[in-house]
Amino acid sequence: MSPQNLKKSLTNWDLVSVNPIDKNWDWKTLFCFWGVNIQSVIGFSLITSLYVIYDLNTFVVFFGTILGTLLVYIFSNLIGKLSQKNGLPFVVLLRSSFGVIGAKYFGLIRFFVGVFLFGIQTYFLSKAFSYLIRIAIFSTEPTILDKEIFLIFFLGMNLIDWTSIIIAIILQGFLFSAGMNVNKRIIIFSAIAVYFGMLLFFLSVLLSDVKFTSQAFLNILKTQNFLDKNNFGPLITVTSTVFAYFSVVILSFGDFSRYVKDESQLKKGNFSLILNLLIFSFFALFIVSGMDAFLKQDPENLNRILTNPTDILGKLDNLFLIFLALIFIIIASASTNLIVNFIPSQYTLVNFLPFSLSIRSAGAIISILGFIIGIFWLTFLSQVGALSF
């Protein structure tokens, strides 16, 4: 292969070292980055389930989650430092370990996993859009939803569902492919907006009956026998669970740390994950405990405590609160999809065909594949156990 062709097969402008002018991420940006990663529906369910479902000592869960995030902090610094220093995405740095060809095919595995999860996440994101549309129609004219056109289903979805998944894929593809400066704004906006939404719901639960909800929060805390040797196993399990939750993000962290100003900002920003965990855990746990206390005043809701935000919304009878919560869920889900699945898939695909693709064209391919995966998720992929591995 000639030197010119070899150069074309190795790089393009999206893979080269970041211009120093574009190294504009500081610790506050990384605070929002880690906030987005924990603010997902899965993150909400995971944190609250660890505290209230498995009958674990509260201190065991607390210190287990702290230890887990400390491990994330250490490994994120190790992986992120190289990308921050050299301004290169993670998949390009892999060339030093796996070689050019090895890095391409290793990255391709990450691409397939990322695109598959992007499609699934897009499907669930579209469900939130469809709920918004249904609420809007129901609030205007409820009988419209009974029309025959809405009773026709294809691949398990009706007209509203198809409209929703098309909206979800177009919005994500358009916004996420606009460049890292736009993605940075999305990340910052999402983190702040979701925390603002959680604060609103926290206050709405608290102020509905301060004494009742505060007592409900205290009642779910289990602090006895923390130093019991039998708690060591659960402590390790919680630590491992939290680390596993962030492991996909750690693997691709260099795709983001390449934009960080310096190593000091990198370490400060990564340490903010612990602060994010504390803030998010408190809000999530208080909302879940307070809602559970109110719901269990009805004998029909005595069976189990709800930790999934969508399950909690299903028990509300206030359309405005449901509508508002769905908007925050959409923001959180979309931004998580951006960080965990879309951007890493872009870089790995461009690295595989650097002479043919750009970030924008790779984004278009990911959007198309994600759409195909999303529309077949309900009727086919979920039925064959596509995530059983």
Question: Could you say what each language-model-derived stretch is?
Answer:
Residues 122, 126-135, 193-223, 245, ...:
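Hydrophobic alpha-helical segments and their helix-loop junctions in multi-pass secondary transporters
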Residues 120, 126, 163-208, 270-273:
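Membrane-interface loop-to-helix entry segments
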Residues 23-27, 177-191, 248-279, 340-361:
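Hydrophobic, small-residue-rich membrane helices and short re-entrant helix-turn-helix hairpins
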Residues 64-98, 108-113, 119-123, 291-295, ...:
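Juxtamembrane transmembrane-helix boundary signature
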Residues 91, 95, 125-159, 338-367:
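Helix-loop-helix connectors at the membrane interface of multi-pass transporters/channels
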